[in-house]
Amino acid sequence: MQNSQLAWATSTFGDAALGDARRTARLVEMAAGVSERPNGRVTQVFEGAEREAAYRLLENRAVAASEVQQAAFRAGARSAAAFNIVFVPVDQSALGLTDRAGTHFGPLSTRNTGVSGLQAVSALLVSPEGVPVGLGAQAIWTRSWSQRAQPHNARPPVEETELQRWIDVLTTSAETLGALAPATLPWFQLDRGGDATPVLRHLARLDVAYTVRASSNRRVATDTGTRSLHEVLGASRWLGAYTLRVPATRDRAARTALVDVRACVVKLIVPLGRSGMGPFEQFTVTALEARERHQPDGAEPIHWRLLTNRSVVTMAAAHDVIVGYTMRWRVEEFHLAWKSGACGIEDSLLRSVAAFTKWATVLATVAIRAEHLKQLSRTTPELPAAAEFSRDEIDAVILLRKPKGVTVGADATVGQLVYWIADIGGYTGKSSGGPPGVRIITRGLERVAAAAAAVTALRLGNGDL
């Protein structure tokens, strides 16, 4: 019986084209090991021969980091094929890494502050219910320590800017989904960092749905002349109100927000070139405004101005756009789990971009799997646990947690099992701040993995549990 970690690792990296079947097998084994003991440092995951094998694979120049990434992207697209629509939130995040020599990576800020690391743009695949199902695409790169000052109003070609990384991620995700999930409509969700004319124009060329949060008060063409986006939206009719659940963060308590919603079709005036001085063209989108009616004292109100290629003439259609945009929070949660929560990729001590990218890709998929279990237990807790866990893993949880009235061999739901796993990881109940998070679930899974290995050994040896 294959445990869920090995089954997951095989489905994620089993088709990686690394030039040798033994390398692919090693990648699968490495991913399974990381899933059992996630950590940013190779030395904290593996020992002895396994550690040496992991380093050989990561540092082998014949093993392209792009092939490891592409395998993860294909696995994500295959998972997305189960849905008619998949949300694809995209976000950029900085990865701060220890680099005492200052020669391995680049600056985190565009202003040289001396802090080194890498940049990443990630496209996460999320089910209509809000459950992460895979990695759509990801770009990881270093900035240059020698940033050239640009003349006033001068803009380099898009290909020489970080916007190209966003465009590459959008393209890779859309093309991979188109090839492996042709019946699934990708609905990209971009925060204000994606509100750039080259990105909007590229999204319009792709056969996808998109929503982008407006970052500027763009000019809009009307029948009577030119007005600002804020003016045109402010004059549009209200469609209704919507109750929005706002999740807790480090800086924000969870709350339920009542937001008023209005929308209208607008013709954005956008430059054809990079100078911003013209010539111009008109770019037709739907603009939607969601404004919180009464926010708690001290809380930043929800106030979104969104640009989408979806038609919004009813409150039901507006609801779909707003729900889709809330999936932006999923990619932020993923980045947190990847960087410092479940996986701690920022603790990595690898010293080459290629080796780091391979390791980071494996840890990214592990973080998504942890987020998948977390959200699945909240959205569809009644799902049979056997859909996500092996029989030996379920029995290991029962043996460790000892739930009242439940014995080895009993059935359980995903909701039950994830809560039991969280208990094993030290969860103290909702009084701790809410349902179990990814860090506590991951801690419990580590203990379950060791117990499940013992259960498997006993079963294969015909021992009694």
Where are these regions (language model features)?
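Single, function-defining residue in the core of a domain
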Residues: 1-104, 112-119, 125-465
